[in-house]
A protein has these predicted regions:
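Phosphate/anion-contacting hairpin/loop surfaces
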Residues: 1-183
Length: 183
């Protein structure tokens, strides 16, 4: 599951802030694929007004933001895989939630991907050695997925991987702003 940037007239969300408007300390924590401490009440300003989406990804940190009906899908079908934190979106009365994916699985199938390259010592990025540098035509090895229904990928955290039942339920309740690609 990832952002559908082709929704005409869509809104764009800024970085999450606390209720006084201060940016939170670590905007990247929502990409880590691990449980986090409750960040407390959050607010999300709009960087560009437009059509409200059912799911979007806020700011540079790409924190997933979902409306209440989608949050309920995750709460019911994947309670051990996610955390949901209420957020107030500028100009919206409807409740939204920050979706923190709390699981990471080492499941990229390098051989089945169109391309999968990892950071190497000669790349002069020592903290990234072994992590993925490029992944295109993403494919996962489903045998490496155990009970997880929603997770991030080790070394390549941007996509949110969801199982088929969750995808179908999200589509049934309405998931404007999301794009689903089989991996």
């Amino acid at each position: 599951m990832k952002i559908d940037v082709y929704v005409k007239g869509r809104w764009y969300l800024s970085e999450p802030t606390d209720l006084s408007g201060r940016q939170i300390d670590d905007i990247w924590q929502f990409l880590d694929g691990r449980r986090i401490a409750d960040p407390g009440p959050l607010s999300i300003p709009l960087s560009r007004p437009g059509k409200a989406l059912d799911i979007d990804f806020a700011g540079a940190g790409q924190a997933p933001i979902v409306k209440a009906s989608l949050a309920n899908v995750f709460r019911v079908l994947a309670p051990n895989d996610v955390q949901l934190f209420p957020v107030k979106i500028e100009g919206q009365a409807e409740p939204f939630f920050l979706l923190n994916v709390a699981r990471t699985v080492r499941a990229i199938d390098d051989a089945a991907c169109e391309e999968a390259r990892r950071w190497a010592p000669e790349d002069d990025e020592p903290e990234k050695i072994g992590q993925y540098h490029v992944v295109s035509g993403l494919r996962i090895d489903k045998a490496k997925v155990e009970s997880e229904r929603v997770f991030r990928l080790w070394g390549w955290p941007s996509p949110i991987i969801i199982d088929e039942e969750i995808k179908e339920e999200l589509e049934r309740v309405g998931a404007s702003g999301a794009r689903f690609d089989e991996v």
